From Swiss-Prot:
This is Hsp70-Hsp90 organising protein. Gene3D superfamilies: Tetratricopeptide repeat domain. Monomer. Homodimer. Forms a complex composed of HOP and chaperones HSP70 and HSP90; the interaction is stronger in the absence of ATP. Interacts (via TPR 1, 2, 3, 7, 8 and 9 repeats) with HSP70 (via C-terminus); the interaction is direct and is stronger in the absence of ATP. Interacts (via TPR 4, 5 and 6 repeats) with HSP90 (via C-terminus); the interaction is direct. It comes from Plasmodium falciparum. It comes from the Eukaryota. Keywords: Chaperone, Coiled coil, Cytoplasm, Repeat, TPR repeat.
Length: 252
C-alpha cells in the first residue's frame, strides 16, 4: 500500500543521515521509503547516491536505472547513472549516459562537468592501455606478427578490451564475435583463457576450492566459538554457578 507521508518522513531521515555521512543508515531509510512509495523517482536517485557513497556501484547503477525508467526526462537520474558507471570504470558508458542527460538539459552544469571529467579520464586510460598493449605485443612474437599484418591491431584490441570492461558479464559473447586474432590478444592481455571446455573445468575446480575453503573457515569459526563458550563456563564464579543451579531448580 502506498503511504506517501511515511515515505516522505523516511526520505527526510535518509537525507539527514546522508548529510552526516551515515550512508548505511541512509540506504536503509531510502529503501524503506521506496517500500512505501515505489514510484517516487527521487527516492531511487537518493538511494543510488547513498550506494555510490559506499562504493556499491552495481547497486547504485541499478537504482539509477530504476529512477530513469520512472522519469526519463529528469536530468539528475542521468547524473546518478553516469556516476555509478564511472565508479565501475565503465567510462565509455558513463560518457554516453551524460550525453543522454544533456539532450534533455543542454545547459546542465553538473552534467557538463561530469562529461568533461569522464572524457579526460577516458583519454588518459586509453593512452595507458595502448602503451601497455604495445608492450605486450612487442614481447609476443605471435601478436607482433598480427600488428605487422594490421597496423590498427592494437586499437582494435583496445576497443574489445574496453567493451569487456563495460560489459564484463557478456565477455564470452563479445569474444565469440571477435576475430580469433583479437580473442588471442585479449586473453594474453588478461593473462588467461576465457573459452573452451578445459577452462570451464578449471573454473569449476576453482569454485570448488573456494567453496571448500569457505566450509573449512566456517567450521574453524564454529570450533573457536565452542571453545570460547567452554572457557567462559569454566571461568564462571561460584556465585554464578549457584545462580544457574537455583534457576534450574525453579524451572524444575
Amino acid at each position: 500500500m502506498v503511504n506517501k507521508e511515511e515515505a516522505q518522513r523516511l526520505k527526510e531521515l535518509g537525507n539527514k543521515c546522508f548529510q552526516e555521512g551515515k550512508y548505511e543508515e541512509a540506504v536503509k531509510y531510502f529503501s524503506d521509503a521506496i517500500t512505501n512509495d515505489p514510484l517516487d523517482h527521487v527516492l531511487y536517485s537518493n538511494l543510488s547516491g547513498a550506494f555510490a557513497s559506499l562504493g556499491r556501484f552495481y547497486e547504485a547503477l541499478e537504482s539509477a536505472n530504476k529512477c530513469i525508467s520512472i522519469k526519463k526526462d529528469w536530468p539528475k537520474g542521468y547524473i546518478r547513472k553516469g556516476c555509478a558507471e564511472h565508479g565501475l570504470r565503465q567510462l565509455s558508458n558513463a560518457e554516453k549516459t551524460y550525453l543522454e542527460g544533456l539532450k534533455i538539459d543542454p545547459n546542465n552544469k553538473s552534467l557538463q562537468d561530469a562529461l568533461s571529467k569522464v572524457r579526460n579520464e577516458n583519454m588518459l586510460e586509453n593512452a595507458q592501455l595502448i602503451a601497455h598493449l604495445n608492450n605486450i605485443i612487442e614481447n609476443d612474437p605471435q601478436l607482433k606478427s598480427y600488428k605487422e599484418e594490421n597496423s590498427n591491431y592494437p586499437h582494435e584490441l583496445l576497443n574489445t578490451i574496453k567493451s569487456i570492461n563495460s560489459n564484463p558479464m557478456n565477455i564470452r559473447i563479445i569474444l565469440s564475435t571477435c576475430h580469433p586474432k583479437i580473442s588471442e590478444g585479449v586473453e594474453k592481455f588478461f593473462g588467461f583463457k576465457f573459452t573452451g571446455e578445459g577452462n570451464d573445468a578449471e573454473e569449476r575446480q576453482r569454485q570448488q576450492r573456494e567453496e571448500e575453503e569457505r566450509r573449512k573457515k566456517k567450521e574453524e569459526e564454529e570450533r573457536k566459538k565452542k571453545e570460547e563458550e567452554e572457557m567462559k563456563k569454566q571461568n564462571r564464579t561460584p556465585e554464578q554457578i549457584q545462580g544457574d543451579e537455583h534457576k534450574l531448580k525453579v524451572m524444575n
